[in-house]
Every structure is written in C-alpha cells, then in structure tokens.
Amino acid sequence: METIDKIKQQINENPILLYMKGSPKFPSCGFSARAVEAIIQCQVPFGYVDILTNPDIRSELPKFANWPTFPQLWVEGELIGGCDIILEMFQKGELHTLLKETATKHG
C-alpha cells in the first residue's frame, strides 16, 4: 500500500486521530505530550500514530496535510492543527465540545 493511501485509510478509520511523536503513555516530545494530555482530558476514545516508528508517514504526511509539524490532530477527516491550536481550543472549551460530539456521533 502506498504511504498516502495508508494515511488516508488511517484518517478515514479513526474519527479522532493524533499523529504524534511517541505514544499517549510515552510521548517523545513536549509538543506531543501537551497535545495528547489535552485530548486525554476530553475523555474520548482516539487513535494515534507514532511517526517515530513510521518514517514513511513522518515524511509524507506534512506534504499531504500541507502542515509541516507534528503533532497533527485530525477529526472526521479534517486537519484541526498542531499543538498550539489544540491547546488554544482546549482552553476555550472548543476541543472538548468537538471531540465529545465526534465521539458521540461515531460511538
């Protein structure tokens, strides 16, 4: 399977998906750690892809998404953004609302 097809499949199969460095329990960078903590606090199920163990995705996703950095949060097939946007949405209560609505819809 081509890397782009793999990315599309991951995004389609996971209504809430975080591309990050490391895993939710063991994030490998500060940005991923802060982003995943905000998502965990929303108490919804979400998928993740560790880009450190998937170098093909690490190199192709920024081109596909037109977003150069990680982490990247995808919700219902749309890129929401990286760490700064995730944290800003979390502080405003918008992240919780978006993720709860998405989880309920796909629950």
Swiss-Prot record:
Gene3D superfamilies: Glutaredoxin. It is found in: Cytoplasm. The keyword DNA damage does not apply. Residues 4-106 form the Glutaredoxin domain. GO terms for molecular function: 2 iron, 2 sulfur cluster binding; disulfide oxidoreductase activity; metal ion binding. Keywords: 2Fe-2S, Cytoplasm, Iron, Iron-sulfur, Metal-binding, Redox-active center. This is Glutaredoxin 4.
